[in-house]
Amino acid sequence: MESGVNLGRRLRLSTISLLALWAGTASAQNRVITADRMIDVQTGKSVEYPAIFVGEDGRISNIADARTVRWGSDVKHINLSGKTLLPGLVDMHVHLDSPANIGGYRGLEFTDSFWGMTAVANGQAMLDAGFTTVRNVGSGNRNDIGLKQAIDAGYVQGPRIVPAGYALGATGGHCDSTFLPPSLDKGEK
């Protein structure tokens, strides 16, 4: 997996995909988001000068032409001139608490709580890269569930998480994090 930070920097050069984040905050208020372009995923076309209205419930209530539509002074305006909006991206296979650069026996050097901290950093990196929803498909110590709770409670920023908790796998197989043979438990040599 490419570093989320590097991926985020590349994506932010040409697009802004925080629309879903703003639309989904708990303290949603009436607001309008304007930009130079918006990708319409249903038609596959670029829409020029969109004005996206977000209601009290955090949902998009209307999309209009920013050059002709007007809104009241009670509506918060988020001006993203020069940017292109796209819907939040979804990644259906992530391991937020498993940094790609730490594998094998090297993982045994770290405490259990370390992996939860990496999940926080990787969740933020995924969000910065434009991913607003992820499915975490296995996490030691249920770090994905803890991160989801912290995000939902507003303690940290990150994408919506569909957690799995512990991964399922065969002893000695893909999900066996000890990397040790089952015979070791029996004292065999």
Describe these PLM feature segments:
Residues M38, T43-L86:
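Histidine-rich, glycine-flanked metal-binding segment
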Residues I78, R135-N136, P163:
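General beta-strand structural signal in soluble alpha/beta enzymes
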Residues Y155-K189:
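Metal-coordinating catalytic core of metallo-dependent amide/deamination hydrolases
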Residues A23-T25:
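N-terminal signal peptide c-region/cleavage motif recognized by signal peptidases
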Residues S46, R70-G72, L127-D128, G154-Q157:
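Extracellular/periplasmic catalytic domains that process cell-envelope and extracellular macromolecules
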Residues E2-S17:
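Bacterial N-terminal signal peptides that target proteins for export
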